[in-house]
């Protein structure tokens, strides 16, 4: 067997799967090394994909030719579009998935990807020569050689699990940790740290009193994660909600002395936006209840996931506390919740391509960069895989801007600001979120993927056809005139003001009460135009309506983004000796030396860099 590859990806989680698929589909001879081929794409925590901002990332991965969206659609057991009551910039798709099917769907994708080989083993050491990674050695003693390596090891690097005072080595429940790999990297000047995450108890559905819970149903309209998924009705299994109470909190408080988070056993930092139940009761002592979500793990299992009850308290405390909730009075569990500590690497030592600034041709993606979440990992993975291929075969680095994708925001935040806690994406982190909607990820990114070779001709033509149809609908509304006497009765029925004189159709659709769907039956010529749409009709109509209703906001945000682009075009890397620029503040000098930003715009986003510091650099550049 030949153990020489263009690209090797270490770890087959969500980052690793996307990285390996991207590199291989672009033509690189690729090897994906995993400790367990039966855990490829494992959902280590909740059996769900998407959510606020995360759903947008999955759509972006799909638009770039990745697979997370397709795998999710094929294994979904409930779909919802979150934040529908808000504007479309906030709409976020989310799906419950069948955990077991998700793994096997990912495995089928990867096993059928040309240029990709899967190897089951544990990597112990990277081979680094003259500041460049050239290969690796596994625990079986196999030496691999590679032009580029992508590290996507998740929580497995020196992983340590906690339940009460009990500590157990492992990267996930009943799975061994990976040792020595961190040390083989840090000895070359890369900085590592420790972070913590956790997962909740898993429950036997047969022990739950569902009649004491509220149901949470799915939705069955046209929305999906993938732009190329086959249109089909997704299965819609129920989820349920319930609440903790003061009795639950009392039991939890009684166990705090045995909590590894509060007795000093765990020193590392956990995710702020996914706190454990014990953190909730400590930080919000006056809150009488906390909402919990009970989610199915799959179609053919009794196992349920209790979202909102992450805990590393002793098992007996977890069970006793839950039994104080009426619906869980006869509770039976499959396994308790636990916390896990793991190694991560300082992401400010990375380029925007996710290649290390310290070790050439070594890329990092996923939780090893200090992020949390399947979606954040997948987004980093596809970018790392693309750039690893480019490093092997030549080409311009692939970098996504903050106005192009949530993935661009994510990576820029990591490499520019760094992390002091597990990083989770939110819509509030994106300054151009009206430009980064879930409905238009394909129109933002698929052409770039096509030029790379990651998206094929037929998909690109499908995009062009969609864009043409949207343009046709919008242009019709701009030119078609409406007479007041012909439409006023309909407007009154729809709860909006009557016209005093004629107007263009686009002006009517701009009203809050009017949609394309409810106005079209009253405008036969418009209905005729809509009926000409042959494929993806609902998707095209929604996109056209968003463009019409939010044109002013979209144009304004685009103008602001274009102004910032001027700073993005001013390259400063290698132009200054920051240590000797006394006109900069001490903090600015320290931060600029550490981050070594590529552009003036990136410098302006570094915490501690003031507008006056940017003005100093502009003056020195002669601008």
Kindly label every feature range from the protein language model:
Residues 38, 54, 183-319, 416-502, ...:
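An anion/pyrophosphate-binding glycine-rich loop and adjacent beta-alpha core
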Residues 305-371, 399-412, 537-591, 596:
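A glycine-rich dinucleotide-binding beta-alpha-beta segment and adjacent secondary-structure elements
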């Amino acid at each position: 067997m030949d153990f020489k590859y263009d690209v090797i990806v270490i770890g087959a989680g969500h980052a690793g799967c996307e990285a390996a698929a991207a590199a291989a589909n672009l033509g690189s001879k690729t090897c994906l090394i995993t400790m367990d081929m039966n855990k490829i794409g494992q959902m280590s925590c909740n059996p769900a994909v998407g959510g606020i901002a995360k759903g947008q990332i999955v759509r972006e991965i799909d638009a770039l030719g990745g697979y997370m969206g397709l795998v999710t659609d094929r294994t979904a057991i409930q779909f919802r579009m979150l934040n529908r009551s808000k504007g479309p910039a906030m709409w976020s798709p989310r799906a419950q998935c069948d955990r077991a099917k998700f793994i096997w769907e990912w495995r089928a994708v990867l096993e059928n990807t040309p240029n990709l080989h899967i190897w089951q083993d544990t990597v112990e050491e990277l081979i680094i020569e003259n500041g460049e990674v050239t290969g690796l050695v596994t625990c079986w003693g196999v030496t691999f050689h590679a032009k580029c390596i992508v590290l996507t090891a998740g929580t497995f690097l020196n992983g340590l699990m906690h339940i009460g005072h009990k500590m157990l080595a492992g990267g996930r429940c009943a799975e061994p940790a990976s040792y020595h790999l961190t040390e083989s990297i840090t000895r070359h000047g890369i900085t590592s740290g420790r972070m913590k995450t956790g997962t909740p108890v898993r429950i036997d559905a047969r022990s739950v009193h569902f009649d004491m819970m509220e149901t949470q149903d799915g939705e069955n309209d046209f929305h999906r994660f993938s732009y190329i998924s086959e249109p089909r009705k997704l299965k819609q299994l129920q989820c349920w909600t319930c609440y903790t109470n003061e009795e639950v909190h009392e039991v939890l408080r009684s166990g705090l002395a045995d909590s590894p988070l509060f007795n000093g056993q765990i020193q590392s930092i956990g995710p702020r936006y996914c706190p454990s139940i014990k953190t909730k009761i400590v930080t919000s002592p006056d809150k009488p209840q906390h909402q919990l979500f009970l989610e199915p793990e799959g179609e053919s299992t009794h196992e349920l996931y209790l979202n909102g009850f992450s805990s590393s308290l002793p098992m007996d405390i977890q069970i006793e506390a839950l039994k104080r909730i009426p619906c869980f009075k006869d509770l039976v569990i499959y396994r308790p919740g636990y916390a896990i500590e793991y190694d991560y690497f300082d992401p400010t030592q990375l380029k925007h391509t996710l290649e290390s600034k310290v070790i050439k041709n070594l890329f990092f993606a996923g939780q090893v960069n200090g992020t949390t979440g399947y979606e954040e990992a997948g987004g980093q993975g596809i970018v790392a895989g693309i750039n690893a291929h480019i490093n092997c075969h030549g080409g311009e680095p692939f970098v996504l801007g903050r106005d192009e994708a949530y993935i661009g925001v994510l990576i820029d935040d990591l490499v520019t600001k760094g992390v002091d806690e597990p990083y989770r994406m939110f819509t509030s982190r994106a300054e151009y979120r009206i430009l980064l909607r879930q409905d238009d990820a394909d129109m933002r990114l698929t052409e770039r993927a096509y030029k790379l070779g990651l998206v094929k001709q037929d998909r690109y033509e499908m995009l062009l056809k969609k864009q043409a149809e949207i343009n046709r609908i919008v242009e019709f509304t701009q030119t078609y005139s409406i007479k007041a006497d012909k439409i006023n009765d309909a407007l009154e029925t729809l709860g909006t003001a009557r016209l005093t004189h004629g107007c263009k159709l686009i002006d009517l659709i701009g009203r809050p009460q009017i949609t394309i769907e409810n106005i079209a039956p009253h405008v036969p010529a418009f209905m005729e135009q809509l009926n000409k749409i042959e494929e993806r009709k609902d998707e095209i109509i929604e996109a056209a309506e968003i463009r019409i209703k939010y044109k002013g906001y979209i144009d304004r945000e685009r103008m602001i983004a274009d102004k910032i682009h001027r700073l993005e075009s001013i390259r400063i890397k290698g132009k200054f000796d920051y240590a000797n620029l006394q006109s900069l503040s001490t903090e600015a000098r320290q931060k600029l030396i550490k981050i070594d930003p590529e552009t003036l715009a990136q410098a302006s986003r570094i915490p501690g860099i003031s507008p006056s510091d940017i003005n100093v650099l502009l003056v020195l550049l002669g601008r």
